[in-house]
Each structure stands twice: as C-alpha cells, then as structure tokens.
Regions:
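Conserved glycine-rich Rossmann-like NAD(P)H-binding loop of the short-chain dehydrogenase/reductase
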Residues: 27-40
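Conserved glycine-rich cofactor-binding loop
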Residues: 11-12
Length: 250
C-alpha cells in the first residue's frame, strides 16, 4: 500500500506545491485547507493521488474531520504542518485579542492538537513543522506571527525530546522567503505598520523569492530521503548550501 501524507494549508503556495510533488512521488495525499475552491484546483492536477478535506486546523471540529479522512487500513507516514496566518500585520501595541488568538489557534494549537490526535496513526512516520525565520528574528508588525512561530519551533524541540524513544520522528524546516499569496499580502501593508516593507518589495522586484515548487523539492527530499537521525537533528534551512546538491538537481 502506498504511503499516506497529510498536508495542511494545501490550497496554495508551499502546501499546494508539496502536495503535487509528493503525489508525483507515488504518495497518497490528504490535502487540507479552508477554501474548497483552492483545494479542488490542487486535486484536479492529480485526482488519483490527492484527496481533499475542507477543514480549519484552528478548531477541534476541523482537526477531527482530518482524522476521520484517513482511509481504513492505511498508515499515515507523513504529517506536514504548513497552514499558517500572518494577517494582520500590525504593531503589538494595537493588535486586538481576537486576532492574537487566531494566530495562536492556527499557527500553534493547530499543529499541537492535530499531532496529538494523529500520533496513534503514525507508525514509524514523520511529522514536519514549516517554520520561519520570523521564529528567530523580530520584525516590527509581525509580533503575533513571530511569537506563534517561535512557539511552533519550541513545540518541535519538546516533541523531539518526548518522542525520542518512539518510532516517530519530528522535524522542522525554514523555507526562506517564498513567492506565495502570503508574500503578496505582505507587500500591501502600510510601511507605518511594517517598517521592513521595502526589503520585501525589493526581494520581489529583484526576483529573489523562491518558487513554491523549489521549496517543495527541498521538503520532499527531507521527508522521503533523509535518515531518521538527520531528519530530527536540527531545523533545516533551505539556504544552507551543504545539502543543496542532494535535492536541487532532482
């Protein structure tokens, strides 16, 4: 039986590209997202391998819906926590509690409690967090996003410790700055709320954003081809040249 992957945030950007990449590699994929039209667009490119689930990872009903989508008798091999929100970009002095809680619900609670529900289904499998440089570097205006990504990084570290004696491995990757709808929104934010705005405009204008398909190659290599001890040992960074020869030419 083919291996099974669950990918959240699979309607666009990195999640969509990774879904298609794994499907090409003969992996069955449950593609999860909130917008059904985006998911259907993803599924049309490989309907034999891709099953879609419209669900919000930020609430328990959505997470339970994902769990129930696993076909009977099929073992979950890969769980990729890609879904995330960045909006609104606003100083912490002005963020409201509802927006703050949405960041925590989707970016932190979603990965934690979906992992918790799926642990019994992951036999000898791998869990991967899609992290961000924002977890390690503060940007004015990204307070809610940065703190949620920092929490996600710590979840990776703690789960790695707690699962070290099991047959489940957990990893984390930093995909760099990627040409996704999230980046489109970032460039529309007023500079008064996001002082680093021009940096991100320049990256786009200078063609320095990575294509989601390139990032998907990187992630699929980590998921499918690295050894267990390598997979969990550190947070992988796409910009680290030491590993690029193993996946960039594929």
């Amino acid at each position: 039986m083919r291996p099974l992957a669950i990918i959240t945030g699979a309607g666009s950007g990195i999640g969509k590209a990774l879904t298609l990449r794994l499907a090409e590699k003969n992996v069955d994929v449950i593609a999860v997202g909130r917008r059904i039209s985006k998911l259907e667009s993803t599924q049309k490119e490989n309907p034999a391998r891709i099953k879609i689930v419209q669900a919000d990872v930020g609430n328990d009903d959505g997470r339970e819906k994902i769990v129930k989508a696993i076909p009977s008798g099929q073992t979950l091999k890969y769980l990729v926590h890609n879904a995330a929100v960045l909006d609104p970009v606003i100083p912490l002095s002005r963020i409201n509690i509802n927006d703050w809680r949405i960041h925590q619900a989707i970016n932190v609670e979603g990965p934690l409690f979906l992992t918790q529900k799926l642990l019994p289904s992951i036999n000898g499998g791998r869990i991967l967090h899609i992290s961000s440089g924002a977890a390690h570097h503060p940007y004015s205006g990204w307070g809610a996003y940065s703190t949620s990504k920092a929490a996600l990084y710590m979840l990776y570290l703690v789960l790695r410790e707690e699962l070290k004696d099991s047959d489940i491995r957990i990893g984390s990757i930093r995909p760099g700055v990627v040409d996704t709808p999230m980046q489109d929104k970032i460039r529309e934010v007023p500079e008064s709320d996001f002082p680093a705005l021009q940096k991100f405009i320049n990256l786009k204008e200078q063609n320095k954003l990575s294509a989601p398909s390139i990032v998907a190659k990187f992630i699929s290599w980590i998921l499918l081809e690295t050894a267990d001890d390598e997979f969990s040992a550190r947070e992988w960074d796409i910009r680290d040249e030491s590993h690029q020869e193993f996946w960039m030419e594929d």
